[in-house]
UniProtKB/Swiss-Prot annotation:
Pfam families: YjeF_N
EC number: 5.1.99.6
Catalytic function, reaction form: (6R)-NADHX = (6S)-NADHX; (6R)-NADPHX = (6S)-NADPHX
Provenance organism: Bordetella pertussis (strain Tohama I / ATCC BAA-589 / NCTC 13251)
Function: Catalyzes the epimerization of the S- and R-forms of NAD(P)HX, a damaged form of NAD(P)H that is a result of enzymatic or heat-dependent hydration. This is a prerequisite for the S-specific NAD(P)H-hydrate dehydratase to allow the repair of both epimers of NAD(P)HX.
Gene responsible for this protein: nnrE
Residues given in the record as K(+) binding sites: 54, 115, 151
Top-level taxon: Bacteria
Protein name: NAD(P)H-hydrate epimerase
Length: 228
């Protein structure tokens, strides 16, 4: 079955948590594999890690890519102090691997950027500091892999957050986990998402169906029929 709403993704995450399935290592591995398939070892990768679990996914990817011979830098504008538990463990693993983090972007553009600043839960406009960082990343014009959704783009509407609208990360690729919100398939979202890919993180169709239940399946089917 297809997962096409943010609430459905959250339902899958809750069931995985109850079953003791750690999804962040799977998401980070999927991101690392995605980068490794498109960039030679030894290249410079910049992972942008935000204050939530999206940042944790980026940290897992950073740790794995460093182990594969990539030159990886991590930027954490909000620092690690308020990371949720799973993301904190990803941060600790990154530090144990010899990694460090900066609050500021480097002077020179990397070969590729991993956008793990904000995920599908972001519902507020970006403030000036976050917007300035994203503007600088966009100005580099290097390949960008957005995890779940380009930061600054609403996963619920497919539109930039804010009034007037902000300027999200302009991704080359967007790698969604578990499901792709239907709004991200809308024509207006394509300019920000780039090419869209999906990783189910090894979860089976039966698991997904159990997580969202019959009502969720019916809603997903209706969304497919009425979507853009």
């Amino acid at each position: 079955m297809d997962i096409e709403r943010v609430e459905q993704v959250r339902a899958v995450e809750r069931l995985a948590h109850r079953r003791g399935l750690a999804l962040m290592p799977r998401a980070g591995l999927a991101a690392a594999d995605f980068v490794a398939a498109r960039l030679p070892a030894g290249a410079q990768v910049l992972a942008l890690a935000g204050p939530g679990n999206n940042g944790g996914d980026a940290l897992v990817a950073a740790t794995l890519l460093q182990a594969r011979g990539y030159r990886v830098a991590v930027v954490m504008p909000a620092g690690p102090a308020r990371l949720p538990d799973d993301a904190r463990r990803a941060w600790q693993d990154w530090c144990a691997a010899g990694g460090q983090a900066s609050a500021d972007l480097p002077a020179h553009a990397p070969a590729l950027v991993i956008d793990g600043l904000f995920g599908i839960g972001l519902a507020r406009p970006l403030d000036g500091a976050w917007q300035g960082l994203i503007d600088q990343v966009n100005a580099w014009r290097v390949p960008v892999l957005a995890l779940d959704v380009p930061s600054g783009l609403s996963a619920a509407s497919g539109q930039p957050l804010g009034d007037p609208p902000g300027r999200p990360v302009r991704a080359t690729w967007t790698l969604s986990f578990i499901g792709v919100p239907a709004a991200l398939r809308a024509p207006g979202a394509a300019a920000w998402c780039g090419e869209q890919y999906l990783s189910l993180l090894g979860l089976t169709p039966a698991f997904l169906a159990e997580a969202v239940g019959p009502c969720g399946q019916a809603t997903a089917t209706a969304a497919r029929r009425s979507g853009p």
